[in-house]
């Protein structure tokens, strides 16, 4: 696959906390902004009630009901989960409560997300036991819940496409200046309302103090179908 800058993007990689942590927002920044507070109109209504995007099951796309979490060992996953919970990107929910919350199909199968990493080639490698390892971008594989959601373009429907700029006509001495900047970690700073949890449980259980806990994403996950629409709207509102 080809990335944003035309570079080749590799296959999914197994996650380790040491490789993921450098690419995440700091504690106190991650999951620190309530998305619904900055949203208005159609986007705010969807944030408060994700059922507005939910399709009838007969219209769901063909997709797996659960996806793999890419970690090479239970110990690696436990460390990763603990770090993400500490930052507020994931939260632990008692399994019996999670089982009642999670979105299921008509056969009773829960829809559960996966997780994997993609190399961030421009970041300095991290050292593990003296060996350099690439920093990984944390990706949530949200194919199962995405298959249940309508398309939602909202604010992005009026963004210009690159081809439209070719139709601009300038005077002889006219200059058209465009600037842009990557918004690092922008998905993981926005916390979504509790009503979204049913769509955002991941395919893994942890045990804390003898109790089984299901992990749920609390933020606008990179890979969520309406993620770009939501974050574009939120940043536009901030700049107004």
Regions found by a protein language model. Give the residues of each.
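Non-catalytic, polymerase-adjacent accessory regions of viral genome-replication enzymes
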Residues: 1-87, 91-92, 164-165
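Catalytic-core region of right-hand nucleic acid polymerases
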Residues: 5, 60-236
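Short, intrinsically disordered, charge-balanced linker/junction segments flanking boundaries
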Residues: 238-240
């Amino acid at each position: 696959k080809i990335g944003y800058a035309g570079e080749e993007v590799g296959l999914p990689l197994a996650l380790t906390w040491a490789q993921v942590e450098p690419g995440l927002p700091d504690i106190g920044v991650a999951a620190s902004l309530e998305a619904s507070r900055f949203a208005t109109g159609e986007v705010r209504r969807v944030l408060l009630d994700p059922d507005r995007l939910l399709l009838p099951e007969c219209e769901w796309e063909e997709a797996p009901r659960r996806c793999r979490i890419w970690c090479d060992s239970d110990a690696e996953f436990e460390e990763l989960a603990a770090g993400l919970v500490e930052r507020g990107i994931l939260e632990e929910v008692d399994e019996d409560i999670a089982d009642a919350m999670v979105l299921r199909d008509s056969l009773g199968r829960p829809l559960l997300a996966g997780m994997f990493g993609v190399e961030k080639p421009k970041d300095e490698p991290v050292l593990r036991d003296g060996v350099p390892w690439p920093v990984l971008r944390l990706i949530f594989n949200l194919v199962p819940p995405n298959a249940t959601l309508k398309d939602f373009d909202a604010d992005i429907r009026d963004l210009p496409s690159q081809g439209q700029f070719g139709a601009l006509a300038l005077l002889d001495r006219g200059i058209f200046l465009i600037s842009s900047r990557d918004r690092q970690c922008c998905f993981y700073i926005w916390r979504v309302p509790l009503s979204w949890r049913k769509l955002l449980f991941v395919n893994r259980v942890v045990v804390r103090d003898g109790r089984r806990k299901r992990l749920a994403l609390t933020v606008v996950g990179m890979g969520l179908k309406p993620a770009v629409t939501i974050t574009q709207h939120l940043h536009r509102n901030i700049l107004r």
